[in-house]
A protein has these predicted regions:
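Long, charged, low-complexity intrinsically disordered regions
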Residues: 1-68
């Protein structure tokens, strides 16, 4: 499963990084947001905007699984 790790990416840059990744890759994939609530919310908002189905990993709250 492809993976995007957002550790080290600023909140300012997350929109461009996540959009590039989700539009260039086939699902399923995962995005590692870490435990920053702001980073998780920014990422989920982008996924919702593009109508991707997603859920938080049952094993890691800092990981979003995209299944669309």
């Amino acid at each position: 499963m492809k993976e995007l790790d957002l550790h080290g990416i600023s909140h300012y840059d997350v929109k461009d990084v996540v959009e590039n990744f989700i539009l260039m890759n086939d699902t399923p994939f995962r995005i590692i947001t870490g435990y920053s609530e702001r980073m998780r919310n920014l990422t989920k908002n982008i996924l919702d905007k593009h109508k991707f189905k997603h859920h938080t990993s049952a094993h890691n709250a800092g990981e979003i699984i995209i299944t669309n």
